[in-house]
């Protein structure tokens, strides 16, 4: 049994979840090469759809994601990757999770506090 990379232009959706708290940290995409690299190295690696290249999460920030467990869905076209984050946050905007906004009365509002300064980590670019 193999993952189905053919359904979505060679990609599977990767839901990244904190293995201890269960909080969803981010969603990314993996092609076969990124998935293989993730399994081989134990660090979450993705396919950047905008840059069209492999992307080791935490490559520039140092906030890598250590893989603890990988599961797949019934259609074999998505993976759930449980990780231990090596840093204060996963989101490039300075938050623990990329899911820091919540819909409140029809408006998106920031619902979490920043966990680090992205300007200090990324040199002013976010």
Swiss-Prot record:
Positions contributing to Mg(2+) binding: 73, 75, 77
Biological or metabolic pathway of the protein: Amino-acid biosynthesis; L-histidine biosynthesis; L-histidine from 5-phospho-alpha-D-ribose 1-diphosphate: step 3/9
Known EC number: 3.5.4.19
Textual note on the cofactor: Binds 1 Mg(2+) ion per subunit.
Positions bound to Zn(2+): 74, 91, 98
GO function term, MF aspect, one: phosphoribosyl-AMP cyclohydrolase activity
Any single GO BP term: L-histidine biosynthetic process
Cofactor(s) essential for the protein: Mg(2+); Zn(2+)
GO terms under cellular component: cytoplasm
Keyword Amino-acid biosynthesis: yes
Pfam family, one: PRA-CH
Coiled coil: none
Subcellular location(s) per record: Cytoplasm
Listed NCBIfam families: PRK00051.1
Family note: Belongs to the PRA-CH family.
Function per UniProt: Catalyzes the hydrolysis of the adenine ring of phosphoribosyl-AMP.
Oligomeric form and interacting partners: Homodimer.
Protein name stated in the entry: Phosphoribosyl-AMP cyclohydrolase
Lineage summary: Bacteria, Pseudomonadati, Acidobacteriota, Terriglobia, Bryobacterales
């Amino acid at each position: 049994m193999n993952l189905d990379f053919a359904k979505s232009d060679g990609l599977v959706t990767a839901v990244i979840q904190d293995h201890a708290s269960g909080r969803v940290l981010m969603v990314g995409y993996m092609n076969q090469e990124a998935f293989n690299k993730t399994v081989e190295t134990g660090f979450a690696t993705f396919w950047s759809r905008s840059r069209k290249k492999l992307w080791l999460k935490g490559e520039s920030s140092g906030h890598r994601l250590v893989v603890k467990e990988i599961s797949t869905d019934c259609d074999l076209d998505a993976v759930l990757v449980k990780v231990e984050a090596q840093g204060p946050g996963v989101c490039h905007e300075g938050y623990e999770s990329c899911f820091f906004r919540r819909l409140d009365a029809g408006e998106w509002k920031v619902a979490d506090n920043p966990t680090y300064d992205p300007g200090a980590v990324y040199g002013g670019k976010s």
